[in-house]
Regions:
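Active-site loop/helix belt of alpha/beta enzymes
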Residues: 11-12, 46-51, 58-63, 104-106, ...
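Short acidic/glycine-rich loop or secondary-structure boundary segments that cap or lie
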Residues: 211-214, 229-232, 259-262, 287-291, ...
Length: 321
Protein backbone atom coordinates (compact mmCIF):
# COMPACT_ATOMS: atom_id res chain seq x y z
CA UNK A 1 0.00 0.00 0.00
CA UNK A 2 1.42 3.35 -1.03
CA UNK A 3 2.01 5.95 1.61
CA UNK A 4 -0.34 8.95 1.51
CA UNK A 5 1.13 12.18 0.21
CA UNK A 6 1.98 14.64 2.95
CA UNK A 7 1.90 18.35 2.11
CA UNK A 8 5.31 19.71 1.17
CA UNK A 9 6.69 21.17 3.28
CA UNK A 10 4.67 19.13 5.83
CA UNK A 11 2.51 21.24 8.13
CA UNK A 12 1.90 18.36 10.51
CA UNK A 13 3.30 14.91 11.05
CA UNK A 14 0.04 12.96 11.36
CA UNK A 15 -2.55 12.30 8.66
CA UNK A 16 -5.90 10.60 9.21
CA UNK A 17 -7.35 9.02 6.07
CA UNK A 18 -11.05 8.18 5.87
CA UNK A 19 -12.05 5.65 3.22
CA UNK A 20 -15.61 6.59 2.31
CA UNK A 21 -15.90 3.65 -0.10
CA UNK A 22 -15.12 1.30 2.79
CA UNK A 23 -17.71 3.13 4.89
CA UNK A 24 -20.32 2.63 2.17
CA UNK A 25 -19.36 -1.05 1.89
CA UNK A 26 -19.81 -1.52 5.63
CA UNK A 27 -23.21 0.18 5.58
CA UNK A 28 -24.40 -1.97 2.69
CA UNK A 29 -23.05 -5.09 4.40
CA UNK A 30 -24.93 -4.34 7.61
CA UNK A 31 -28.11 -3.42 5.77
CA UNK A 32 -28.01 -6.64 3.76
CA UNK A 33 -28.08 -8.57 7.04
CA UNK A 34 -31.44 -7.08 8.03
CA UNK A 35 -34.86 -8.35 7.15
CA UNK A 36 -36.92 -6.42 4.64
CA UNK A 37 -38.45 -3.32 6.23
CA UNK A 38 -35.82 -2.93 8.96
CA UNK A 39 -33.88 0.32 8.73
CA UNK A 40 -30.13 0.54 9.19
CA UNK A 41 -29.63 3.79 11.08
CA UNK A 42 -26.29 5.49 11.67
CA UNK A 43 -24.91 6.80 14.95
CA UNK A 44 -22.79 9.87 14.17
CA UNK A 45 -21.84 11.03 17.65
CA UNK A 46 -18.59 12.89 18.30
CA UNK A 47 -18.08 14.09 14.73
CA UNK A 48 -19.04 10.67 13.37
CA UNK A 49 -16.50 8.85 15.55
CA UNK A 50 -13.89 11.37 14.48
CA UNK A 51 -14.34 10.58 10.79
CA UNK A 52 -15.99 13.88 9.85
CA UNK A 53 -19.75 14.20 10.10
CA UNK A 54 -20.12 16.20 6.90
CA UNK A 55 -18.52 13.70 4.55
CA UNK A 56 -19.80 10.64 6.42
CA UNK A 57 -23.42 11.77 6.60
CA UNK A 58 -23.50 12.76 2.94
CA UNK A 59 -22.13 9.39 1.84
CA UNK A 60 -24.48 7.43 4.09
CA UNK A 61 -27.41 9.43 2.76
CA UNK A 62 -26.37 8.48 -0.77
CA UNK A 63 -26.40 4.85 0.36
CA UNK A 64 -29.99 5.22 1.57
CA UNK A 65 -29.62 5.94 5.28
CA UNK A 66 -32.49 8.05 6.62
CA UNK A 67 -32.28 7.56 10.40
CA UNK A 68 -29.38 9.37 12.09
CA UNK A 69 -28.51 9.43 15.79
CA UNK A 70 -26.34 11.97 17.62
CA UNK A 71 -25.64 12.68 21.27
CA UNK A 72 -26.21 16.42 21.58
CA UNK A 73 -28.46 19.11 20.15
CA UNK A 74 -25.51 21.00 18.67
CA UNK A 75 -24.49 17.87 16.75
CA UNK A 76 -28.01 17.55 15.34
CA UNK A 77 -28.07 21.14 14.12
CA UNK A 78 -24.70 20.69 12.45
CA UNK A 79 -25.74 17.41 10.83
CA UNK A 80 -28.84 19.02 9.37
CA UNK A 81 -26.64 21.35 7.33
CA UNK A 82 -25.22 18.48 5.28
CA UNK A 83 -28.12 16.23 4.31
CA UNK A 84 -31.54 16.78 2.72
CA UNK A 85 -34.60 17.27 4.91
CA UNK A 86 -36.19 13.87 4.30
CA UNK A 87 -34.36 12.32 7.25
CA UNK A 88 -34.90 11.70 10.95
CA UNK A 89 -32.33 13.07 13.40
CA UNK A 90 -32.59 11.69 16.94
CA UNK A 91 -30.78 13.34 19.85
CA UNK A 92 -29.93 10.53 22.26
CA UNK A 93 -29.01 12.50 25.38
CA UNK A 94 -32.49 13.90 25.81
CA UNK A 95 -34.29 17.22 26.09
CA UNK A 96 -32.56 19.73 28.34
CA UNK A 97 -34.44 22.65 29.81
CA UNK A 98 -35.02 25.64 27.54
CA UNK A 99 -34.10 23.66 24.42
CA UNK A 100 -37.68 23.03 23.30
CA UNK A 101 -37.89 25.95 20.87
CA UNK A 102 -34.64 24.96 19.19
CA UNK A 103 -35.82 21.38 18.65
CA UNK A 104 -39.09 22.67 17.26
CA UNK A 105 -37.43 25.18 14.95
CA UNK A 106 -35.11 22.58 13.40
CA UNK A 107 -37.68 19.77 13.47
CA UNK A 108 -35.36 17.50 15.44
CA UNK A 109 -36.39 14.44 17.44
CA UNK A 110 -35.53 14.46 21.15
CA UNK A 111 -35.11 11.06 22.77
CA UNK A 112 -37.13 11.60 25.95
CA UNK A 113 -35.72 9.74 28.93
CA UNK A 114 -37.72 10.87 31.97
CA UNK A 115 -41.17 12.10 32.97
CA UNK A 116 -40.09 15.73 33.18
CA UNK A 117 -38.82 15.72 29.60
CA UNK A 118 -42.07 14.16 28.39
CA UNK A 119 -44.15 16.76 30.20
CA UNK A 120 -42.09 19.68 28.92
CA UNK A 121 -42.07 18.48 25.33
CA UNK A 122 -45.81 17.88 25.22
CA UNK A 123 -46.50 21.24 26.89
CA UNK A 124 -44.30 22.99 24.35
CA UNK A 125 -46.11 21.26 21.49
CA UNK A 126 -49.42 22.51 22.87
CA UNK A 127 -48.22 26.10 22.99
CA UNK A 128 -47.12 25.83 19.36
CA UNK A 129 -50.38 24.15 18.37
CA UNK A 130 -48.38 21.47 16.59
CA UNK A 131 -47.73 17.79 17.08
CA UNK A 132 -43.96 17.40 17.28
CA UNK A 133 -42.16 14.08 16.98
CA UNK A 134 -40.25 12.40 19.82
CA UNK A 135 -38.70 9.08 20.72
CA UNK A 136 -38.95 7.39 24.11
CA UNK A 137 -35.99 5.73 25.77
CA UNK A 138 -36.81 2.89 28.18
CA UNK A 139 -34.09 1.79 30.60
CA UNK A 140 -34.06 -2.00 30.47
CA UNK A 141 -30.79 -2.50 32.32
CA UNK A 142 -28.12 -0.06 31.16
CA UNK A 143 -28.94 2.24 34.10
CA UNK A 144 -27.64 5.45 32.55
CA UNK A 145 -30.50 7.30 30.91
CA UNK A 146 -34.06 6.34 30.10
CA UNK A 147 -37.38 5.74 31.81
CA UNK A 148 -37.22 2.93 34.38
CA UNK A 149 -40.08 0.41 34.18
CA UNK A 150 -41.88 1.96 37.18
CA UNK A 151 -42.11 5.27 35.32
CA UNK A 152 -43.18 3.63 32.08
CA UNK A 153 -46.12 2.21 34.02
CA UNK A 154 -47.18 5.76 34.93
CA UNK A 155 -47.46 6.91 31.32
CA UNK A 156 -50.88 7.70 29.91
CA UNK A 157 -51.83 8.48 26.33
CA UNK A 158 -52.89 11.93 27.54
CA UNK A 159 -49.22 12.61 28.29
CA UNK A 160 -48.69 12.63 24.53
CA UNK A 161 -51.75 14.55 23.37
CA UNK A 162 -49.57 16.82 21.24
CA UNK A 163 -46.63 14.47 20.69
CA UNK A 164 -46.11 11.92 17.94
CA UNK A 165 -44.14 9.01 19.40
CA UNK A 166 -42.10 7.96 16.40
CA UNK A 167 -39.84 5.41 18.07
CA UNK A 168 -39.39 3.41 21.26
CA UNK A 169 -35.82 2.51 22.04
CA UNK A 170 -33.54 1.00 24.63
CA UNK A 171 -29.83 0.22 24.81
CA UNK A 172 -28.14 -3.14 25.35
CA UNK A 173 -25.52 -3.22 28.09
CA UNK A 174 -23.76 -6.44 27.10
CA UNK A 175 -24.33 -6.74 23.36
CA UNK A 176 -20.60 -7.10 22.79
CA UNK A 177 -20.69 -10.31 24.85
CA UNK A 178 -22.98 -12.47 22.77
CA UNK A 179 -23.58 -15.26 25.33
CA UNK A 180 -24.39 -12.84 28.17
CA UNK A 181 -27.80 -13.62 29.69
CA UNK A 182 -28.50 -9.93 30.17
CA UNK A 183 -29.10 -9.53 26.44
CA UNK A 184 -32.15 -11.76 26.49
CA UNK A 185 -33.33 -10.27 29.80
CA UNK A 186 -33.24 -6.78 28.34
CA UNK A 187 -34.95 -7.88 25.14
CA UNK A 188 -37.79 -9.53 27.05
CA UNK A 189 -38.31 -6.43 29.20
CA UNK A 190 -38.19 -4.22 26.10
CA UNK A 191 -40.91 -6.35 24.47
CA UNK A 192 -43.06 -6.00 27.57
CA UNK A 193 -42.66 -2.24 27.89
CA UNK A 194 -43.15 -1.37 24.24
CA UNK A 195 -46.55 -3.07 24.10
CA UNK A 196 -48.02 0.18 25.37
CA UNK A 197 -46.90 1.86 22.14
CA UNK A 198 -47.62 -0.67 19.37
CA UNK A 199 -47.84 2.08 16.75
CA UNK A 200 -44.23 3.25 17.26
CA UNK A 201 -41.08 1.96 15.61
CA UNK A 202 -38.85 -0.10 17.90
CA UNK A 203 -35.07 0.11 18.20
CA UNK A 204 -32.93 -1.97 20.56
CA UNK A 205 -29.78 -3.02 18.71
CA UNK A 206 -26.58 -1.04 18.58
CA UNK A 207 -23.62 -2.39 16.58
CA UNK A 208 -23.25 -5.28 19.01
CA UNK A 209 -26.97 -5.97 18.89
CA UNK A 210 -26.81 -6.33 15.12
CA UNK A 211 -24.54 -9.35 15.54
CA UNK A 212 -26.91 -10.93 18.08
CA UNK A 213 -29.31 -11.76 15.28
CA UNK A 214 -32.77 -10.86 13.92
CA UNK A 215 -34.56 -11.14 17.28
CA UNK A 216 -32.74 -7.96 18.32
CA UNK A 217 -33.15 -5.96 15.10
CA UNK A 218 -36.78 -4.78 15.33
CA UNK A 219 -37.49 -1.74 13.09
CA UNK A 220 -34.24 0.24 13.36
CA UNK A 221 -30.70 -0.92 14.06
CA UNK A 222 -28.36 1.82 15.31
CA UNK A 223 -25.00 1.13 13.69
CA UNK A 224 -22.06 3.07 15.07
CA UNK A 225 -18.74 1.37 15.71
CA UNK A 226 -19.54 -1.28 13.11
CA UNK A 227 -19.58 1.38 10.39
CA UNK A 228 -15.91 2.12 11.05
CA UNK A 229 -15.01 -1.49 10.32
CA UNK A 230 -13.11 -1.84 13.57
CA UNK A 231 -15.87 -3.72 15.38
CA UNK A 232 -15.03 -7.12 13.93
CA UNK A 233 -11.33 -6.83 14.79
CA UNK A 234 -11.88 -5.50 18.31
CA UNK A 235 -14.40 -8.16 19.29
CA UNK A 236 -12.99 -10.96 17.10
CA UNK A 237 -16.17 -11.48 15.12
CA UNK A 238 -16.09 -12.78 11.57
CA UNK A 239 -17.75 -10.12 9.46
CA UNK A 240 -16.93 -8.81 5.97
CA UNK A 241 -16.32 -5.27 7.18
CA UNK A 242 -13.52 -3.05 5.90
CA UNK A 243 -11.40 -0.64 7.96
CA UNK A 244 -12.41 2.95 7.32
CA UNK A 245 -9.87 4.86 9.41
CA UNK A 246 -6.12 4.78 8.86
CA UNK A 247 -3.62 7.03 10.60
CA UNK A 248 -0.25 7.78 9.06
CA UNK A 249 2.62 9.36 10.98
CA UNK A 250 5.88 10.71 9.66
CA UNK A 251 9.24 9.41 10.80
CA UNK A 252 11.17 12.32 12.26
CA UNK A 253 14.40 10.49 13.02
CA UNK A 254 16.06 7.08 12.82
CA UNK A 255 18.50 6.06 15.55
CA UNK A 256 20.90 3.14 15.63
CA UNK A 257 21.16 1.97 19.25
CA UNK A 258 23.32 -0.61 20.97
CA UNK A 259 22.34 -3.37 23.36
CA UNK A 260 21.77 -1.83 26.79
CA UNK A 261 20.74 1.62 25.50
CA UNK A 262 17.51 3.07 26.94
CA UNK A 263 14.70 4.69 24.99
CA UNK A 264 12.38 7.46 26.14
CA UNK A 265 11.13 8.75 29.47
CA UNK A 266 11.94 6.73 32.59
CA UNK A 267 14.12 4.39 30.52
CA UNK A 268 11.30 1.84 30.42
CA UNK A 269 12.69 0.22 27.26
CA UNK A 270 16.21 -1.20 27.25
CA UNK A 271 17.45 -2.53 23.93
CA UNK A 272 18.35 -6.21 24.20
CA UNK A 273 20.37 -6.07 20.97
CA UNK A 274 21.63 -3.61 18.41
CA UNK A 275 18.43 -2.03 17.15
CA UNK A 276 17.03 0.56 14.79
CA UNK A 277 14.58 2.92 16.49
CA UNK A 278 12.27 5.27 14.57
CA UNK A 279 10.85 8.37 16.22
CA UNK A 280 7.34 9.26 15.03
CA UNK A 281 5.78 12.70 15.29
CA UNK A 282 2.68 11.51 17.09
CA UNK A 283 1.85 11.02 20.77
CA UNK A 284 -0.90 10.98 23.34
CA UNK A 285 -1.90 14.55 22.43
CA UNK A 286 -2.96 13.08 19.08
CA UNK A 287 -4.94 10.28 20.71
CA UNK A 288 -2.36 7.50 20.72
CA UNK A 289 -2.83 6.33 24.28
CA UNK A 290 0.02 6.59 26.77
CA UNK A 291 -1.11 3.22 28.13
CA UNK A 292 0.17 1.67 24.88
CA UNK A 293 3.75 2.44 25.91
CA UNK A 294 5.83 -0.72 25.34
CA UNK A 295 2.60 -2.53 24.46
CA UNK A 296 1.17 -1.07 21.27
CA UNK A 297 2.01 -1.89 17.67
CA UNK A 298 2.01 0.06 14.42
CA UNK A 299 2.57 -0.82 10.78
CA UNK A 300 5.93 0.06 9.27
CA UNK A 301 6.26 -0.67 5.54
CA UNK A 302 3.45 -3.21 5.87
CA UNK A 303 4.94 -5.01 8.88
CA UNK A 304 3.65 -4.80 12.44
CA UNK A 305 6.34 -3.44 14.75
CA UNK A 306 6.26 -2.75 18.50
CA UNK A 307 6.19 0.54 20.36
CA UNK A 308 9.50 0.90 22.19
CA UNK A 309 9.42 3.05 25.31
CA UNK A 310 7.00 5.62 26.66
CA UNK A 311 4.47 7.32 24.42
CA UNK A 312 5.02 11.02 25.12
CA UNK A 313 2.88 14.02 24.26
CA UNK A 314 3.85 14.47 20.62
CA UNK A 315 6.49 11.80 20.02
CA UNK A 316 6.71 8.03 20.20
CA UNK A 317 9.35 5.49 19.27
CA UNK A 318 9.05 2.16 17.49
CA UNK A 319 11.47 -0.69 16.94
CA UNK A 320 11.99 -1.13 13.19
CA UNK A 321 15.02 -3.41 13.42
Amino acid sequence: MAKPPFPHPPSMSLALLIDLDALAHNYRTLRSGLKRGTHCGAVLKANAYGMGVREVSMRLYQEGCRHFFVAHLSEAIELQCFVPKDIYIYVLNGLRKREEKVYGHYNLIPVLGNLDQIQRWNAFSKTQKECFKAALHFDTGMTRTGLPPKDVAKLELSDFSNTEILCIMSHLACAYQAPHTMNETQRDLFDKLRKRFPFALASLANSGGFFLGPKYHYDIVRAGLALTGSYAAIFQIKAPLKPVIKAYAQILQLNEVSAGDSIGYDATFIASRASRIATLGVGYADGYLRSLSNRGEVYFSGTRVPVAGRVSMDLMTIDVT
